[in-house]
Amino acid sequence: MSTRRETRAQAQQFIDNLKPLQHPNSEKVYLVGSRDDIRVGMRQIHQSETMIGGTESHPVLESNPPLKVYDCAGPYSDPNAKINVREGLDKFRANWILERNDTEQLIAASSGFTQQRLADYGLDHLRFDSLLSPRKAKQGQCVTQLHYARQGIVTPEMEYIAIRENMALSEVTDEALTQKAEGESFGAAISQPITPEFVRQEVARGRAIIPLNINHPEAEPMIIGRNFLVKVNANIGNSAVTSSIEEEVEKLVWSTRWGADTVMDLSTGRYIHETREWIIRNSPVPIGTVPIYQALEKVNGVAEDLTWEIFRDTLLEQAEQGVDYFTIHAGVLLRYVPMTAKRLTGIVSRGGSIMAKWCLSHHLENFLYEHFRDICELCAAYDVSLSLGDGMRPGSIADANDEAQFSELETLGELVKIAWEYDVQTIIEGPGHIPMNLIKENMDKQLEVCDEAPFYTLGPQTTDIAPGYDHFTSGIGAAMIAWYGCAMLCYVTPKEHLGLPNKEDVKQGLITYKIAAHAGDVAKGHPTAQIRDNALSKARFEFRWEDQYNLGLDPDTARAYHDESLPQESAKVAHFCSMCGPKFCSMKISQEVREYAAAQEVKLHTDTEFKAKSVKESGMAQMSAEFKAKGAALYHESGALVEDVELVETEG
């Protein structure tokens, strides 16, 4: 096990030597929009050819076109990009912001705390090297994407998103790949294809948000909404007892490689301000925070000493650094706190417990609720989106869907309408720990009381019996609520409830939640979702092993598992599944039946039902005879080519 010193040194080495890295057999390609500076990066996965006839020495091959998929890694997956974490990423969105002519550059930071940090020369060794002066809306101007959408303006960001969400759907012409189940969307209105105008309409309606602070021009436009691809958030951040700036930057880059659509910096330790600056300047995805965490640090962890003035200064500090969305626990009202007294696990939200303690100690209403309009005014000046925190979320399935949880949700529904008055983009946070039978009630109630504002949930976790495996227990609930209409899922790692996640934990959590999000997209009938499934299934049936790995969410692990038992080069082109060997692979048998039918010149699906049935029965009888002749063993040791076996889907 690495020591803290070794872990930090490894992270430092990682960022010092950071170079763009692409997944196997993939390349970075760009789709260009209506103007040259709208260049949408995609991951293009190349596939091998399929043998459709001939012999091994003279094969007849059919090409399988490359597949474009969503890529969250930004420049980190582009071999032509120049990466220097001390300079940050290219500010490619800066011109879009400037040409709107509704912002101005500030002479100095507005936050008193920021000014103190900049004046402290003792922090120079921690400071990001290339700081710029922040921007803010001009007097009387609103600079949010919601404001533009309501004015009927289709921004470059909206066009970028439409291209990104479509994933070059129009290029896919193979019916084997475009086939999909009808889907059950539970009232969602998914467009096919997704147009820039559709993006504008959804944002204007409040059903979707584009979290892009004007001070984070490095971020690539993305959208969070029920009628778009389900997104996944990854949490990183230091704590009072572990981690460093180097490690958090490493986790950021690592998170985007494995599909984080947004990243929340939940730092609670030393140097929160400096850590966040490094993260934002090097992030191609939107960054969220929970500002109350840093505000609490400013009063030495004493919740009772928090004030609106300290919190407001923290909002200014973070908005001018470029934070794209704030989690604000404004729905934790004084009268709701007693409702948690009979709970099995009380209040488990950190932000919720901080505000509950403040309310009780002062016997006053939550100052975040009282000053919510002030918060909205501030956010509108920087286009910071609001994520209304669920401070009363249940921390155990025993407390699910109780009075405290749903009372707060009603208040969040009131607050979202206030935020919309200020053209502030808003999403609603949700639970938590919910058994499967109560999940849909959560989604339905949120849609009703929050007027379809996007829902963003932590899981939900469906059972409480598996510490160390809560990415599984919550991934189940995440897939369900994604199907029902949740717009973004906050990942859970294997370390949930146990400790701060490391790099491998982050990857495990992300892969689990990308599966959940994708399963939700498929079930809803999203037009692009099933194409990748079909491409991988086709590769699996044709025994194109490398394509199977590369089309998957985690090519590295798939390849490693295969090579663990079948390391030989011959196994990588073997035309049988390795669980049952070459004699009893179900997919190989299916192929042989097809070949037999073709040899008999029977055209399946067009000939008579009798002939089709006859050929099928004849083929099965032949395989039955072979099975019995070889000992009638269910599993069979294969010959000299391959000695071991690999799992594939089989019936029974």
Curated annotation (Swiss-Prot):
One of its GO terms (biological process) is thiamine diphosphate biosynthetic process. Its cofactor is [4Fe-4S] cluster. It comes from the Bacteria. Zn(2+) binds at residues 433, 497. It holds the Pfam family ThiC_Rad_SAM. Binds 1 [4Fe-4S] cluster per subunit. The cluster is coordinated with 3 cysteines and an exchangeable S-adenosyl-L-methionine. It is an enzyme of class 4 (lyase). [4Fe-4S] cluster binds at residues 577, 580, 585. InterPro entries: ThiC, ThiC-associated_dom, ThiC/Bza_core_dom, ThiC/BzaA/B. Pathway: Cofactor biosynthesis; thiamine diphosphate biosynthesis. It catalyses: 5-amino-1-(5-phospho-beta-D-ribosyl)imidazole + S-adenosyl-L-methionine = 4-amino-2-methyl-5-(phosphooxymethyl)pyrimidine + CO + 5'-deoxyadenosine + formate + L-methionine + 3 H(+). Substrate binds at residues 235, 264, 293, 329, 349-351, 390-393, 429, 456. Its EC number is 4.1.99.17. GO terms for molecular function: 4 iron, 4 sulfur cluster binding; carbon-carbon lyase activity; zinc ion binding. One of its GO terms (cellular component) is cytosol. Keywords: 4Fe-4S, Iron, Iron-sulfur, Lyase, Metal-binding, S-adenosyl-L-methionine, Thiamine biosynthesis, Zinc. Homodimer. Catalyzes the synthesis of the hydroxymethylpyrimidine phosphate (HMP-P) moiety of thiamine from aminoimidazole ribotide (AIR) in a radical S-adenosyl-L-methionine (SAM)-dependent reaction. Belongs to the ThiC family. This is Phosphomethylpyrimidine synthase. It comes from Shewanella sediminis (strain HAW-EB3).
